[in-house]
């Protein structure tokens, strides 16, 4: 049986989160009534001239810098000509041979692997989005409606080299790309709202061959899971075709998420089919190096850089660092809490386990979480300073969720400070030993885990307020002085 190698390249369209459209002053707010965010430019009315949105240009440059691209100091816009109901001008303003960014790449790590992988980028170019067709849900009314609110929304198209060899690589590449775009805040990357869309180019070839096979472009991929599933299906289909000695044309397919298969949409057009030519209404763009450096100075610390700092400077485990840097807002929250607590590992545990536990359970973002980073930091500081135990901290956390008080106020009002009175703890320890003779016997016979039952008794009697370290040390001393059980 012949063995084949999968070749994958991805084209990602990311809407830039500007207030207005790329060539007009119309708003870009999602969810507005149909055709309420249009003007003569995005409607393609005669005599309406486009003017480039400077903010869109800056965000495109920032994305290029973040991905390590070369920023073109000379760039221009071109008309991509085709006819479709959601394109009122009969052409799309895009970039053909002089994109704003070239080269660069995306580094990512597949879950469970130690080493990272790198996928090269071909280019990043700017273009305007098309409108949206809304099809009638009633099969007896074969009508489609056009909403041009989205027409003219600024996009960057991020085109990768065909460097990926599996759907897993594509999946984690997309996760890393999305994380970077959100970190630098040029796009909200909300796939449900269509602000991040992906097309996959898939082909196979015999292993060892350096020639590319016939390529299929897959569209209608509205989630990363859909990208993975579509690639897996397409690779299986192409492999079956090859094994049966059949050929097929280069084509565009749609992903049918109901049937879980790719469906042919049309034979693939080549670039000459679009009759690209420079847009005569838009002047060429000549950037100054100072402009690029000004944008570079605004670039925040990127996810991989931040993750490495958390591991190398703060001493966090790699897993913790990956969780905390998955989103910029989470990493910011952690660092703000750390400024108060002073203990990186304890703060990490509380943010990734307790805070994100609530965030995920309630399906909210961390910016919507009711407890500020400073209040969580205050709670962790009480733990780090030995003023409260982990068990008491959970009680305080529950109170933080429903009140505006800080942790120290809650601990004081509820008298939850850890008990360090030697005589009081010794009294409870003696009681625990006397009332847990079975556990004492097991411990003395070498079953160290039996100590937990005795400690649990002490914590129950003290209502969780006894100093755990003092309890453990006192128990070990007292049990060590007892004769071993026969």
From Swiss-Prot:
**Briefly, what is this protein's role?**
Allows the formation of correctly charged Asn-tRNA(Asn) or Gln-tRNA(Gln) through the transamidation of misacylated Asp-tRNA(Asn) or Glu-tRNA(Gln) in organisms which lack either or both of asparaginyl-tRNA or glutaminyl-tRNA synthetases. The reaction takes place in the presence of glutamine and ATP through an activated phospho-Asp-tRNA(Asn) or phospho-Glu-tRNA(Gln).
The organism's superkingdom is given as Bacteria
Q: Which reaction does it catalyse?
A: L-glutamyl-tRNA(Gln) + L-glutamine + ATP + H2O = L-glutaminyl-tRNA(Gln) + L-glutamate + ADP + phosphate + H(+); L-aspartyl-tRNA(Asn) + L-glutamine + ATP + H2O = L-asparaginyl-tRNA(Asn) + L-glutamate + ADP + phosphate + 2 H(+)
Q: Indicate yes or no for the key word Ligase.
A: yes
Write out the GO biological process terms: glutaminyl-tRNAGln biosynthesis via transamidation; translation
* Originating species: Leptospira borgpetersenii serovar Hardjo-bovis (strain L550)
The UniProt keyword set, sorted, is: ATP-binding, Ligase, Nucleotide-binding, Protein biosynthesis
Question: Could you identify this protein by its name?
Answer: Aspartyl/glutamyl-tRNA(Asn/Gln) amidotransferase subunit B
Tell me if Nucleotide-binding is a UniProt keyword of this record: yes
Provide the assembly information: Heterotrimer of A, B and C subunits.
Pfam families registered for this protein in UniProt:
GatB_N (PF02934), GatB_Yqey (PF02637)
Enzyme Commission no = 6.3.5.-
An MF annotation (GO) of this entry? ATP binding
Which PROSITE patterns would you find in this protein's record?
GATB
SMART domains this protein is in? GatB_Yqey (SM00845)
UniProt record similarity statement: Belongs to the GatB/GatE family. GatB subfamily.
């Amino acid at each position: 049986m012949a063995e084949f190698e999968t070749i994958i390249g991805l084209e990602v369209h990311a809407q830039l989160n500007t207030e207005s459209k790329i060539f007009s002053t119309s708003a870009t707010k999602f969810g507005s009534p149909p055709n309420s965010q249009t003007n003569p430019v995005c409607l393609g009315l005669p005599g309406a001239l486009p003017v480039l949105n400077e903010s869109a240009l800056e965000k495109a440059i920032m994305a290029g810098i973040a991905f390590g691209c070369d920023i073109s100091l000379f760039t221009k816009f071109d008309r991509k000509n085709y006819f479709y109901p959601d394109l009122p001008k009969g052409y799309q303003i895009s970039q053909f041979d002089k994109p704003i960014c070239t080269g660069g790449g995306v580094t990512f790590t597949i879950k469970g692997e130690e080493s990272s992988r790198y996928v090269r980028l071909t280019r990043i170019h700017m273009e305007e989005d098309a409108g949206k067709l809304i099809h009638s849900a009633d099969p007896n009314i074969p009508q489609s409606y056009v909403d041009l609110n989205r027409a003219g929304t600024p996009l960057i198209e991020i085109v990768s080299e065909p460097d990926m060899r599996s759907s897993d690589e594509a999946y984690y590449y997309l996760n890393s790309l999305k994380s970077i775009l959100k970190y630098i805040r040029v796009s909200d990357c909300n796939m449900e709202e269509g602000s991040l869309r992906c097309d996959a180019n898939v082909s196979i070839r015999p292993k060892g061959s350096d020639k590319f096979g016939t390529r299929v472009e897959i569209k209608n991929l509205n989630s990363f899971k859909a990208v993975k599933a579509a690639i897996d299906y397409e690779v299986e289909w192409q492999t079956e075709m090859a094994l049966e000695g059949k050929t097929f044309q280069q084509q565009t397919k749609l992903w049918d998420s109901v049937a879980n298969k790719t469906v042919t949409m049309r034979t693939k057009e080549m670039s000459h089919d679009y009759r690209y030519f420079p847009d005569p209404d838009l002047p060429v763009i000549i950037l100054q190096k100072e402009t690029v450096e000004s944008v570079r100075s605004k670039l925040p610390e990127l996810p991989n850089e931040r993750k490495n700092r958390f591991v190398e400077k703060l001493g966090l485990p790699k897993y913790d660092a990956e969780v905390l840097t998955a989103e910029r807002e989470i990493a910011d929250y952690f660092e703000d809490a750390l400024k108060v607590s002073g203990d990186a590992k304890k703060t990490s545990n509380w943010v990734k386990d307790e805070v994100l536990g609530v965030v995920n359970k309630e399906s909210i973002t961390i910016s919507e979480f009711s407890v500020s980073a400073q209040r969580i930091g205050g709670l962790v500081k009480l733990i780090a300073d030995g003023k409260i135990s982990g068990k008491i901290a959970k009680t305080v956390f529950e109170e933080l969720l429903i009140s505006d008080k800080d942790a120290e106020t809650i601990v004081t009002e509820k008298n939850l400070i850890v008990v360090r009175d030697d005589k009081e703890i010794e009294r409870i320890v003696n009681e625990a030993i006397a009332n847990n003779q079975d556990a004492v016997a097991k411990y003395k016979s070498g079953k160290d885990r039996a100590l937990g039952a005795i400690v649990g008794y002490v914590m129950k009697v003290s209502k969780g307020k006894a100093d755990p370290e003092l309890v453990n040390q006192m128990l070990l001393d007292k049990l060590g002085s007892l004769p071993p059980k026969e």
